[in-house]
């Protein structure tokens, strides 16, 4: 009898959602690791190419304004065809990871060709969703760029609150699109409907998960430092290689956990919304 991990039988607490994410992660890690490994390597292709050509990984100009520097760096990346190719590969493989996790968590047999074919088929919808979601969030913080100096950062700090609300409301859009096959706009609307009224609940979940991932990367950094001391003997090239490989391994493991958490959150919100809708339908005749 297959072990059904999705959807949960009832609405869950924050701890139970994280536990569900870890159970999905453990059950699917080995079968998702090839996708995650290729995705992590693909994500590093622009940096590897620049290193091979002797180009600096970061822009050479001084950082006088952090926000402008980040924006200029992002615009520079978007002009790089290799960055677009790497981003498309990462997007497809990320979608394939969630689709495979959903298949395993629901107790159905998996097939690599099906996962990848579905991910590629839904790529246009995912890209449209990411663009629309990014614009919906960015429109709240763009006014900060009209100011300069400390006023820019003060306004940005104030605008982060509504931007965060929009980001959380749309956070389930990508999983919804992949699992249900809805279009980009329909997935965004469905995500907003699912997350409505659960802002603090989701904020706590994402915050705890972020702390766990930061702790994982910190531990990996310590391990890389120890290995560098033992193996490098002061050789900067060896230190860089050991650190890079360690971080890539951690990223390869962290990527499936990210998607397992997204799936666990989607399952909980779906059960919550279905329960609320059922309660509303049952109470409707009594109020008439």
Region spans (language model):
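Interfacial aromatic "cap" segments that immediately flank transmembrane helices
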Residues: 15-42, 112-139, 165-217
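Long, highly hydrophobic alpha-helical transmembrane signal-anchor segments
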Residues: 50-76, 117-156, 234
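Solvent-exposed, amphipathic alpha-helical "stalk/arm" or coiled-coil-like segments used as scaffolds
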Residues: 86-98, 125-126, 133, 258
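Hydrophobic alpha-helical transmembrane segments of integral membrane proteins
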Residues: 131-134, 138-160, 207, 211, ...
């Amino acid at each position: 009898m297959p072990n059904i991990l999705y959807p949960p039988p009832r609405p869950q607490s924050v701890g139970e959602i994280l536990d569900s994410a870890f159970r999905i992660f453990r059950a699917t890690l080995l079968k998702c690791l090839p996708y995650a490994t290729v995705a992590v390597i693909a994500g590093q292709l622009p940096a590897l190419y620049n290193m091979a050509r002797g180009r600096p990984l970061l822009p050479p100009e001084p950082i006088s304004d952090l926000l402008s520097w980040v924006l200029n760096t992002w615009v520079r990346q978007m002009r790089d065809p290799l960055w677009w190719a790497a981003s498309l590969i990462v997007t497809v493989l990320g979608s394939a990871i969630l689709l495979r996790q959903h298949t395993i968590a629901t107790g159905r047999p998996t097939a690599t060709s099906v996962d990848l074919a579905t991910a590629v088929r839904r790529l246009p919808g995912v890209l449209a969703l990411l663009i629309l979601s990014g614009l919906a969030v960015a429109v709240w913080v763009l006014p900060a760029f009209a100011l300069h100096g400390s006023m820019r950062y003060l306004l940005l700090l104030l605008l982060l609150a509504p931007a965060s609300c929009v980001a959380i409301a749309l956070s389930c859009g990508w999983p919804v699109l992949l699992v249900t096959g809805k279009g980009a706009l329909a997935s965004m609307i469905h995500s907003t409907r699912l997350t409505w009224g659960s802002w603090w609940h989701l904020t706590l979940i994402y915050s705890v998960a972020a702390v766990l991932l930061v702790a994982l990367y910190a531990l990996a950094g310590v391990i890389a430092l120890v290995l560098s001391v033992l193996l490098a003997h002061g050789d900067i090239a060896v230190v860089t290689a050991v650190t890079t490989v360690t971080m890539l391994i951690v990223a390869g493991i962290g990527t499936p956990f990210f998607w397992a958490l997204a799936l666990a959150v989607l399952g909980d919100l779906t059960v919550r919304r279905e329960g609320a809708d059922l309660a509303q339908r049952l109470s409707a005749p009594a109020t008439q």
